[in-house]
């Protein structure tokens, strides 16, 4: 049954670490969801923490390059001034049933480990997954789902799902191009993201989709030519910041479909 118009505003949960998340992967979905009339509720490990992005992505990772594009940076500035960004909910205090959708953004700098490795957050996400509501993950955010377990059976929630994530070749290329100056900045963990995600799948050769090869070309607000996402039922995944606009638009469509179910 279609929900009445007064209930069309959906509540989307977006957990983030205290620092080092990706500018584009947070700010673009936030902007698109907000423009569509939805509420985005941010969650940090401790309630009331004002989170901060990876600062290198605002100025350029190396020689002013490899950072976020101008529009996502502007979106982030708007987000950083918003009330919801300072009024975060604590991970342990989350009630999964209170949200209509869940987005897990990525990032690769060291501060992301707080988010990627939290067993508390993984349990909460496992609980939300059981509700069969829209879930989206982009880049390293897919790792959280790979580590989250179903309530029954103890397998990853992704075990039977099709998915993408940050491709191994892209993570490796970024590391090799910058290691001389930034060390392991692009290597969040010794294992590559793709390797960990594939290991969580029942049949990785058929369930995992790497997508077209990219190195620098990105999707934009007006052009999805270089963007790629994978949708499997209520689950949506994307590879990197270059997919963020398509990812955000598709997630809005998933919310609308869920609202009309």
Stretch-by-stretch model annotation:
Residues 1-131, 144-261:
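Extended, subdomain-level signal for the structured scaffold at the beginning of enzyme domains
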């Amino acid at each position: 049954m279609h929900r009445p118009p007064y209930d069309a505003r959906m509540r989307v949960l977006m957990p983030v670490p205290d620092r080092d998340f990706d500018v584009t992967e947070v700010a673009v979905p936030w902007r698109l969801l907000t423009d569509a009339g939805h509420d985005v509720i941010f969650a940090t490990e401790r309630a009331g923490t004002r989170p901060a992005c990876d600062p290198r992505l605002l100025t350029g990772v190396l020689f002013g390059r490899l950072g976020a594009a101008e529009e996502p940076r502007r979106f982030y500035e708007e987000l950083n001034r918003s009330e919801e960004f300072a009024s975060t909910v604590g991970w342990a205090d989350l009630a999964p049933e209170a949200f209509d959708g869940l987005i897990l953004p990525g990032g690769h700098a060291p501060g992301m480990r707080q988010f990627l490795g939290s067993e508390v957050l993984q349990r909460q996400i496992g609980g939300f997954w059981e509700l069969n509501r829209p879930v989206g993950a982009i880049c390293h955010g897919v790792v959280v789902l790979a580590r989250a377990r179903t309530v029954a059976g103890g397998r990853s929630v992704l075990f039977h799902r099709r998915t993408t994530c940050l491709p191994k070749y892209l993570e490796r290329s970024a590391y090799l191009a910058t290691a001389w100056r930034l060390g392991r900045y692009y290597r969040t963990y010794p294992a590559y993201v793709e390797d960990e995600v594939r290991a969580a799948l029942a049949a990785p050769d058929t369930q995992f989709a790497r997508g077209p090869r990219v190195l620098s070309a990105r999707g934009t607000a007006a052009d999805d030519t270089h963007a790629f996402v994978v949708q499997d039922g209520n689950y949506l995944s994307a590879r990197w910041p270059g997919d963020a606009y398509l990812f955000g638009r598709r997630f809005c469509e998933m919310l609308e479909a869920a609202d009309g179910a």
